[in-house]
């Protein structure tokens, strides 16, 4: 799923040109090399690649359930756990898509394939090629930017073309509002300060230029990543939490 197209981001004062698209050369749609300092490929596999995926994921058009106004998702990763709090009012279309993807375990066993220090962590290419193929063109309409791309906020990756969001997501590692808000990246949730301690530990030493190719991830799945980028961290499970506690606050 190369939904993170070319989104040439001119990250001034310390950032190089980055892109948030769902294609191999973009940033906020496909964070490259999102892994934590781990040595062995086997240790970073997350859930077993042999485990069957939810067959409902092969029919994106049917996954249209409306999300609760607020909900949480617990990510259990090879680096630790963190919780995402979603506010549907910020981006209803994006929140509904995320809710359905998580409900059907789309993100289970997926890798943080792109981690750019001080910029973003990107994920959302399925561990399973048939699932990636099914969601390749399951695009969403763009939404107004109500919340800013501050540290800890989650946003869909997209290309420079309109209406190209699908399933790839990035977490802002710093305040990127000045660069990404005006490009139409609309946050729909956030990771709190405690959870960002885990996100900050995701392996980032492959760099933005030394990470995997998005097309190959889509075609070959998790084995491709485990072989070529064994230190990448991954998501073991992403699970819906019934209610979002009032205490949860953005980073």
Regions found by a protein language model. Give the residues of each.
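Cyclophilin-like peptidyl-prolyl cis-trans isomerases
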Residues: 22-251
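Positively charged n-region of N-terminal signal peptides that target proteins for export
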Residues: 1-4
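Bacterial N-terminal signal peptides
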Residues: 7-18
